[in-house]
């Protein structure tokens, strides 16, 4: 057990040093202090101090959580820059790949550590959800930008297809980390709408947004990638080298999109009706799916 803990601590420390060097580079390039970079750097400094203690006494879960929070802040700064610049065509593919790799490291390390029975669950469900959400949302924003570039689409719709599949998989992964709450006589809820949401696996507004994002990405896939060999896209979902899957999967854009958007509309017009979520776009996409089916 001690050897396993020491191994995790060493690996987290190495990753933390790499991230700190990257933050230094970003700060120098920006030429000004940024709140997210400052917070990320502070977390990594604390991580470094904790890793300097006796490794056998360190809590690997706390260390990995600190590292994860730093990565989330650091990559958020870079994502905002890409969005503000509308994903420049020359550098965005490599930059998105780097960001996905950073956001995948905590999950990869947690999975490797889970091979040791006493190191299971190093990252809680909420952090794992956040990592998947951030990767899926990044690819959503990137694909949204790409769908507005007609010449690029004519040349590289196969790349869009791969980006979409990876993004959808990340969002579906995020939605499936926690099981829906089973409602029974032993569980009491003062708010019936909250109970309905939890029973469908919707735990936050981000879960609702993830459903809309994944449905919209399925729409883009069906609209822009129909010149591919089949509407059932069997692709290598390890597009950027740090995907949530490392094998070939079949993803039917229409089937997946229809299922997730029907749930989105049901939730928004049911338990979330008072919050006035917009369902017009979702219904238009569902109509598009029906036309493609007939």
Swiss-Prot record:
UniProt record, GO biological process = mitophagy
Q: Name one Pfam family in it.
A: RIMC1
Cellular component aspect of the GO annotation: cytosol; nucleoplasm
Cell compartment(s), UniProt: Cytoplasm, Cytosol
The principal location of this protein is cytoplasm
Q: Which residues form a coiled coil?
A: none
N-acetylalanine modification, residue list: 2
Q: Which family does it belong to?
A: Belongs to the RIMOC1 family.
Q: What is this protein called?
A: RAB7A-interacting MON1-CCZ1 complex subunit 1
* Classification lineage: Eukaryota, Metazoa, Chordata, Craniata, Vertebrata
What is the primary gene name for this protein?
Rimoc1
